[in-house]
Amino acid sequence: LEAPPAKTRPADNVVIRVPRLRHCSVHPARTCPRNRSYLRNLQRWCEITSAGVYIWEYGANFKNFIFPWPSVHSIADNIRLYAEMGVRGVMVQGNYVTTGSDLVVLKNYVWRHLMWDPTLKTDPLIREFCDGYYGPAADAMYAYVQAVENSVREPKTIHAGEFARPGYLTQPAREKLRRLRAKTIT
Protein backbone atom coordinates (compact mmCIF):
# COMPACT_ATOMS: atom_id res chain seq x y z
CA LEU A 1 0.00 0.00 0.00
CA GLU A 2 1.41 3.33 -1.03
CA ALA A 3 1.83 5.97 1.63
CA PRO A 4 -0.70 8.79 1.39
CA PRO A 5 0.54 12.18 0.22
CA ALA A 6 2.08 14.41 2.88
CA LYS A 7 0.06 17.54 2.05
CA THR A 8 -2.63 16.76 -0.50
CA ARG A 9 -5.99 15.51 0.76
CA PRO A 10 -8.64 13.62 -1.24
CA ALA A 11 -11.72 15.71 -2.05
CA ASP A 12 -14.79 15.05 0.09
CA ASN A 13 -16.37 12.96 -2.67
CA VAL A 14 -13.32 10.76 -3.32
CA VAL A 15 -13.36 7.26 -1.89
CA ILE A 16 -10.05 5.47 -1.40
CA ARG A 17 -10.06 1.80 -2.41
CA VAL A 18 -7.16 -0.08 -0.81
CA PRO A 19 -6.10 -3.45 -2.22
CA ARG A 20 -4.28 -5.70 0.22
CA LEU A 21 -1.71 -7.12 -2.21
CA ARG A 22 1.78 -8.50 -1.61
CA HIS A 23 1.42 -8.89 2.14
CA CYS A 24 1.21 -11.92 4.40
CA SER A 25 -2.35 -13.20 4.00
CA VAL A 26 -2.22 -16.17 6.37
CA HIS A 27 -1.66 -14.13 9.54
CA PRO A 28 -3.78 -11.25 10.84
CA ALA A 29 -2.56 -7.87 9.62
CA ARG A 30 -2.25 -6.52 13.17
CA THR A 31 0.10 -9.28 14.39
CA CYS A 32 2.30 -10.11 11.40
CA PRO A 33 5.54 -8.12 11.05
CA ARG A 34 5.26 -8.33 7.25
CA ASN A 35 2.13 -6.18 7.38
CA ARG A 36 3.44 -3.25 9.46
CA SER A 37 3.92 -0.80 6.60
CA TYR A 38 0.49 -1.71 5.21
CA LEU A 39 -1.18 -0.91 8.55
CA ARG A 40 0.77 2.30 9.02
CA ASN A 41 -0.22 3.56 5.57
CA LEU A 42 -3.82 2.37 5.94
CA GLN A 43 -4.17 4.25 9.23
CA ARG A 44 -2.89 7.41 7.57
CA TRP A 45 -5.31 7.03 4.64
CA CYS A 46 -8.18 6.62 7.14
CA GLU A 47 -7.09 9.82 8.90
CA ILE A 48 -7.02 12.02 5.78
CA THR A 49 -10.02 10.68 3.85
CA SER A 50 -13.46 12.08 4.63
CA ALA A 51 -15.44 9.97 2.10
CA GLY A 52 -14.04 6.76 3.52
CA VAL A 53 -11.64 3.94 2.85
CA TYR A 54 -12.81 0.67 1.34
CA ILE A 55 -10.66 -2.46 1.48
CA TRP A 56 -10.20 -4.95 -1.32
CA GLU A 57 -9.12 -8.07 0.59
CA TYR A 58 -7.95 -11.30 -1.06
CA GLY A 59 -9.40 -14.50 0.40
CA ALA A 60 -7.96 -17.08 -1.97
CA ASN A 61 -4.66 -18.45 -3.13
CA PHE A 62 -4.81 -17.41 -6.77
CA LYS A 63 -1.89 -19.67 -7.65
CA ASN A 64 -3.78 -22.80 -6.57
CA PHE A 65 -7.50 -22.46 -5.80
CA ILE A 66 -8.05 -25.99 -4.54
CA PHE A 67 -5.04 -26.27 -2.21
CA PRO A 68 -5.88 -25.62 1.48
CA TRP A 69 -5.63 -21.88 2.17
CA PRO A 70 -5.59 -20.87 5.86
CA SER A 71 -7.34 -17.52 5.66
CA VAL A 72 -10.55 -17.84 7.70
CA HIS A 73 -9.10 -16.47 10.96
CA SER A 74 -6.67 -13.97 9.43
CA ILE A 75 -9.33 -12.24 7.34
CA ALA A 76 -11.82 -12.48 10.21
CA ASP A 77 -9.36 -10.58 12.39
CA ASN A 78 -8.70 -8.12 9.58
CA ILE A 79 -12.44 -7.40 9.27
CA ARG A 80 -12.52 -6.57 13.00
CA LEU A 81 -9.42 -4.39 12.66
CA TYR A 82 -10.90 -2.51 9.71
CA ALA A 83 -14.05 -1.81 11.74
CA GLU A 84 -11.89 -0.47 14.60
CA MET A 85 -9.99 1.76 12.17
CA GLY A 86 -13.18 3.24 10.73
CA VAL A 87 -12.95 1.59 7.32
CA ARG A 88 -16.30 2.02 5.54
CA GLY A 89 -16.42 -1.26 3.66
CA VAL A 90 -14.64 -4.51 2.85
CA MET A 91 -14.87 -6.63 -0.27
CA VAL A 92 -13.21 -10.05 -0.10
CA GLN A 93 -12.30 -11.40 -3.52
CA GLY A 94 -12.17 -15.16 -3.51
CA ASN A 95 -12.24 -17.82 -6.12
CA TYR A 96 -13.90 -16.58 -9.29
CA VAL A 97 -13.10 -19.32 -11.81
CA THR A 98 -14.29 -22.54 -10.18
CA THR A 99 -16.77 -23.68 -7.57
CA GLY A 100 -14.36 -26.29 -6.23
CA SER A 101 -12.10 -24.08 -4.20
CA ASP A 102 -10.96 -24.64 -0.64
CA LEU A 103 -13.83 -24.04 1.83
CA VAL A 104 -15.23 -21.14 -0.20
CA VAL A 105 -18.80 -21.47 1.10
CA LEU A 106 -17.65 -21.67 4.73
CA LYS A 107 -15.36 -18.66 4.31
CA ASN A 108 -18.10 -16.59 2.72
CA TYR A 109 -20.46 -17.49 5.57
CA VAL A 110 -17.99 -16.51 8.30
CA TRP A 111 -16.76 -13.31 6.67
CA ARG A 112 -20.25 -12.16 5.73
CA HIS A 113 -21.42 -12.54 9.33
CA LEU A 114 -18.39 -10.61 10.58
CA MET A 115 -19.03 -7.79 8.13
CA TRP A 116 -22.53 -7.52 9.59
CA ASP A 117 -21.27 -7.78 13.18
CA PRO A 118 -17.49 -7.67 13.76
CA THR A 119 -17.94 -8.52 17.47
CA LEU A 120 -18.90 -12.11 16.63
CA LYS A 121 -16.35 -14.83 17.40
CA THR A 122 -14.86 -16.78 14.50
CA ASP A 123 -14.80 -20.33 15.85
CA PRO A 124 -18.50 -20.44 16.85
CA LEU A 125 -19.37 -19.24 13.33
CA ILE A 126 -17.23 -22.01 11.83
CA ARG A 127 -18.90 -24.55 14.14
CA GLU A 128 -22.38 -23.24 13.28
CA PHE A 129 -21.64 -23.50 9.58
CA CYS A 130 -20.18 -27.01 9.84
CA ASP A 131 -23.18 -28.24 11.85
CA GLY A 132 -25.68 -26.77 9.41
CA TYR A 133 -23.90 -27.52 6.14
CA TYR A 134 -22.00 -30.79 6.60
CA GLY A 135 -24.50 -32.71 8.76
CA PRO A 136 -22.99 -36.03 9.91
CA ALA A 137 -19.52 -34.92 8.74
CA ALA A 138 -19.67 -31.70 10.83
CA ASP A 139 -17.21 -32.79 13.52
CA ALA A 140 -14.70 -34.09 10.99
CA MET A 141 -14.99 -30.94 8.86
CA TYR A 142 -14.61 -28.68 11.89
CA ALA A 143 -11.42 -30.57 12.83
CA TYR A 144 -10.20 -30.22 9.23
CA VAL A 145 -10.85 -26.46 9.15
CA GLN A 146 -9.04 -25.99 12.46
CA ALA A 147 -6.08 -28.03 11.19
CA VAL A 148 -5.86 -25.93 8.02
CA GLU A 149 -5.92 -22.74 10.08
CA ASN A 150 -3.40 -24.05 12.64
CA SER A 151 -0.99 -25.16 9.91
CA VAL A 152 0.50 -21.66 9.67
CA ARG A 153 0.18 -20.48 13.26
CA GLU A 154 3.30 -22.34 14.36
CA PRO A 155 5.97 -21.78 13.32
CA LYS A 156 5.26 -18.10 12.80
CA THR A 157 8.04 -18.03 10.20
CA ILE A 158 5.60 -19.34 7.56
CA HIS A 159 4.28 -16.42 5.52
CA ALA A 160 2.29 -16.56 2.31
CA GLY A 161 0.52 -14.10 0.07
CA GLU A 162 -2.30 -14.44 -2.40
CA PHE A 163 -0.09 -16.12 -5.04
CA ALA A 164 1.59 -18.72 -2.80
CA ARG A 165 3.06 -22.00 -3.91
CA PRO A 166 2.04 -25.08 -1.87
CA GLY A 167 5.33 -25.00 0.09
CA TYR A 168 3.73 -22.93 2.85
CA LEU A 169 2.27 -26.17 4.21
CA THR A 170 4.82 -28.59 5.63
CA GLN A 171 4.72 -32.24 4.63
CA PRO A 172 3.48 -33.32 8.10
CA ALA A 173 0.71 -30.70 7.88
CA ARG A 174 -0.33 -31.96 4.43
CA GLU A 175 -0.42 -35.56 5.65
CA LYS A 176 -2.54 -34.57 8.66
CA LEU A 177 -4.96 -32.69 6.39
CA ARG A 178 -5.25 -35.70 4.07
CA ARG A 179 -6.11 -37.96 7.03
CA LEU A 180 -8.69 -35.50 8.37
CA ARG A 181 -10.22 -35.00 4.94
CA ALA A 182 -10.57 -38.76 4.53
CA LYS A 183 -12.61 -38.87 7.76
CA THR A 184 -15.12 -36.45 6.27
CA ILE A 185 -16.14 -38.91 3.57
CA THR A 186 -16.34 -42.12 5.60
Q: Residue ranges of each PLM-predicted region?
A:
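Gly/Pro-rich turn-and-neighbor structural signature
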Residues: 1-47, 57
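Catalytic domains of carbohydrate-active enzymes that cleave complex glycans
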Residues: 2-6, 86-88, 111-186
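Surface-exposed beta-strand edges and their flanking turn/coil or helix-capping segments
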Residues: 8-9, 29-31, 68-70, 105, ...
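Repeat-unit-sized solenoid/scaffold elements
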Residues: 13-35, 82-97, 118, 165-177
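Structured mid-domain segments that build the active-site/substrate or prosthetic-cofactor binding neighborhood
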Residues: 36-137, 143
